[in-house]
């Protein structure tokens, strides 16, 4: 079980949203590179970076920040947000990013997904499944769909993804615990490397996910508010 600290970027700064709402932005560190170094110092081996500006507009906005995180740390970097064409994938991979997270394009442009997986290798890609009230949401969580969780996972499996990260938007940034029923359900449907995200705020949450068979947990706001100490959680596992 791996604990992955999260860095969400808006205007080059490290922020957290509440339930994916862009009008509820909390600034936690104006220097995300410094934040990544702090995570590394605390024992993290991975970092989960999302370009929230990019997710909204459909192209990379905070690329330089992400490239510098990779340059100045030895962290394994997984990043997403607005990655919707081959040139952007190429840009991130050439900067040393280890994993590319694809979300909206899985449903909007599966041909593109097939192409980049063929060119760069499917092991470089993580599928992102974001949902609210049982239905998938796209475009930085701004766009509702009628796609169910099960239909979303079937699509992800058909495309050949070996890694999946899911987020229940209702729990994200709320510090009120994770949707464990969804965790069990998704674990049954997907047998690849599974990462949980959304509302993970206690050591108990992490141990419960581990017992369900989840492979990794992305933790955000709980680390920034001090509710969870990264060193303690890493030592726990």
Curated annotation (Swiss-Prot):
Annotated catalysed reactions:
1-(5-phospho-beta-D-ribosyl)-5-[(5-phospho-beta-D-ribosylamino)methylideneamino]imidazole-4-carboxamide = 5-[(5-phospho-1-deoxy-D-ribulos-1-ylimino)methylamino]-1-(5-phospho-beta-D-ribosyl)imidazole-4-carboxamide
Q: Which residues form the active site?
A: 8 (proton acceptor), 130 (proton donor)
Pathway given for this chain reads: Amino-acid biosynthesis; L-histidine biosynthesis; L-histidine from 5-phospho-alpha-D-ribose 1-diphosphate: step 4/9
Where does this polypeptide localize? Cytoplasm
Q: Which domain of life is it from?
A: Bacteria
Listed GO biological process terms: L-histidine biosynthetic process; L-tryptophan biosynthetic process
Keywords attached to this entry: Amino-acid biosynthesis, Cytoplasm, Histidine biosynthesis, Isomerase
Q: Which GO terms describe its molecular function?
A: 1-(5-phosphoribosyl)-5-[(5-phosphoribosylamino)methylideneamino]imidazole-4-carboxamide isomerase activity
Enzyme Commission number, as recorded: 5.3.1.16
State the InterPro entries in the record. Answer: Aldolase_TIM, His_biosynth, HisA_bact_arch, Isoase_HisA-like, Isoase_HisA-like_bact, RibuloseP-bd_barrel
GO CC annotations, alphabetized? cytoplasm
Primary localization class, coarse: cytoplasm
Q: Which family does it belong to?
A: Belongs to the HisA/HisF family.
Q: Give the matching PANTHER family.
A: 1-(5-PHOSPHORIBOSYL)-5-[(5-PHOSPHORIBOSYLAMINO)METHYLIDENEAMINO] IMIDAZOLE-4-CARBOXAMIDE ISOMERASE
HAMAP family attached to this UniProt entry: HisA
Q: What is this protein called?
A: 1-(5-phosphoribosyl)-5-[(5-phosphoribosylamino)methylideneamino] imidazole-4-carboxamide isomerase
State the organism named in the record.
Caldicellulosiruptor bescii (strain ATCC BAA-1888 / DSM 6725 / KCTC 15123 / Z-1320) (Anaerocellum thermophilum)
Q: What is the lineage of its organism?
A: Bacteria, Bacillati, Bacillota, Bacillota incertae sedis, Caldicellulosiruptorales
């Amino acid at each position: 079980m791996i604990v992955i600290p999260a860095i969400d970027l808006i205007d080059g700064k490290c922020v957290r949203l509440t339930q994916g709402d862009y009008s509820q932005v909390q600034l936690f560190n104006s220097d995300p590179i410094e934040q990544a170094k702090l995570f590394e110092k605390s024992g993290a081996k991975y970092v989960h970076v999302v370009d929230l500006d990019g997710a909204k507009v459909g192209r990379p906005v905070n690329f330089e920040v992400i490239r510098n995180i990779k340059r100045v740390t030895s962290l394994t970097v997984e990043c997403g947000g607005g990655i919707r064409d081959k040139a952007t994938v190429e840009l991130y991979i050439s900067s040393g990013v280890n994993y590319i997270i694809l979300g909206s394009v899985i449903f909007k442009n599966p041909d593109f997904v097939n192409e980049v997986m063929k060119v760069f290798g499917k092991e470089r890609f993580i599928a992102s499944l974001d949902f609210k009230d049982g239905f998938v949401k796209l475009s930085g969580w701004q766009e509702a769909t009628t796609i169910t969780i099960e239909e979303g996972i079937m699509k992800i499996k058909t495309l050949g993804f070996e890694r999946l990260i899911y987020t229940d938007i209702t729990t994200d940034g709320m510090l009120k615990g994770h949707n464990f029923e969804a965790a069990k359900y998704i674990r049954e449907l997907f047998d690849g490397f599974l990462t949980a995200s959304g509302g993970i705020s206690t050591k108990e949450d992490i141990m419960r996910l581990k017992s369900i068979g989840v492979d990794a947990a992305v933790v955000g706001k709980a680390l920034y508010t001090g509710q969870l100490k990264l060193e303690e959680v890493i030592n726990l596992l």
